[in-house]
Amino acid sequence: MSTPHADTRLAAVDIDPSAASAYDTPLGITNPPIDELLDRASSKYALVIYAAKRARQINDYYNQLGDGILEYVGPLVEPGLQEKPLSIAMREIHGDLLEHTEGE
């Protein structure tokens, strides 16, 4: 009894070069580059803590907006559409917009 074989030929696909630019440059860990971010902290662990603390402040800022309390400082860079607080914090660190003392 013979079984039908699937056609295994591949067809060439033409890629439109203008379609490649349809997507924005990714933000966050890939942009700004991690190597440039590491220049702003003594270690990768210090960078993680630094960025996480700032991301928490940004998140708390957004959460307090509805209450009318302005206890936290909002983003110091223009946030992108649906950009995460950690990505915003990374861009602020990269832009040297924050003052930071390690160990606090």
UniProtKB/Swiss-Prot annotation:
NCBIfam families linked: rpoZ
GO molecular function: DNA binding; DNA-directed RNA polymerase activity
Catalytic activity as recorded in UniProt: RNA(n) + a ribonucleoside 5'-triphosphate = RNA(n+1) + diphosphate
Single GO BP term: DNA-templated transcription
Keywords: DNA-directed RNA polymerase, Nucleotidyltransferase, Transcription, Transferase
EC number: 2.7.7.6
Family recorded in the similarity comment: Belongs to the RNA polymerase subunit omega family.
The organism of origin for this protein: Mycolicibacterium vanbaalenii (strain DSM 7251 / JCM 13017 / BCRC 16820 / KCTC 9966 / NRRL B-24157 / PYR-1)
Name of the protein: DNA-directed RNA polymerase subunit omega
Short name of any one Pfam family annotated for the protein: RNA_pol_Rpb6
Role this protein plays: Promotes RNA polymerase assembly. Latches the N- and C-terminal regions of the beta' subunit thereby facilitating its interaction with the beta and alpha subunits.
Quaternary structure note: The RNAP catalytic core consists of 2 alpha, 1 beta, 1 beta' and 1 omega subunit. When a sigma factor is associated with the core the holoenzyme is formed, which can initiate transcription.
One GO CC term on file: DNA-directed RNA polymerase complex
HAMAP family: RNApol_bact_RpoZ
Annotated gene: rpoZ
